[in-house]
Amino acid sequence: MRTDNNEHKALFTIPTAAHSSALANIKPLPEQRRITGHKQTDAYLWVLEVIRLNEPAHLDAAEAALEKIKISPKEAEERYSRYLLANGGDPFQVAFGTIGMDNPARAIKNAREGIKKAASVRATFGSYEAALEDVEAERVIKSSSKFIDDHLWGWTPAEKKAGSINGSRMNEIDEQRRAFVEGYRDVLPEPNTLSDVVREFVYWDWLYSVRHTATKEQGYEFGYSEHHESVYDRERYLEKLLETIKPVTRAEAIEVCRWFLESEKAQYMENDGAAVILNLVGECEE
């Protein structure tokens, strides 16, 4: 019976905690500012800012401070919205700037979840900086003679001179590049089963989540932007394998199907991933 590729499994298994998750430094409290001029509203805004620090040393105190604020979350949101509109904010900016203001309980819940995620990053990598360094799989990809690190790869001299290309041309170049690199199969171990393929997808998703948490903790408002283009080229290759590698057993087919539906990857694939589903409902080896 066909089995998983152990070399692939070793490269794409999510590592276990190997470091202390203790914080080296405590994030400082933000400055209390006069924003709207209404003391209760400004106090509420400050407490929300403290909560969103995801700092365990401050969270319990911030939660206690919420109970002492007399203004309701809804009233604070309305007052802040009026302040933003009166100071030149457009409706979109106001809506974005007040997201979550009426639900401090959710902000606290998100903060506690963020604290857990940050602790997991530190426990796995030792530091946020280390989480952003290339993992072994990325180093292997970069060892390929086909590795591309040129964002203008495939552009004509005229396109480079113009400094832009349209969407259809961009898609054309993406397809050419993916055909050229072939998922970096020249250096990465080949998945032997659908379980291998899923494991690798899960690994890349996990790595993105880890780096998003790490960069947020480093103070980047929007977190981690995206993996290197080579990772997404690899994932497009893996999508093809989901369509072609036959499930070993019916149990594997069911597990992969469950993962595929929950992952929502089908919405980005041709015919909503119909080829993957057809492969999974077909014959198995056992």
Question: How would you label these PLM feature ranges?
Answer:
Residues 1-141:
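Intrinsically disordered, low-structural-confidence terminal and linker regions
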Residues 59, 163, 187-197, 221, ...:
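Amphipathic alpha-helical coiled-coil segments with heptad-repeat character
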Residues 119, 124-125, 129-172:
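Low-complexity, serine/threonine/proline-enriched polar segments
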Residues 167, 177-203:
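Short, charge/polar-rich alpha-helical segments
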Residues 194-215, 238:
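Non-transmembrane amphipathic alpha-helical segments
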Residues 208-219, 267-271:
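Extended, well-ordered alpha-helical segments in internal regulatory regions
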Residues 216-224, 247:
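Charged, low-complexity interaction regions
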Residues 229-286:
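Alpha-helical oligomerization segments
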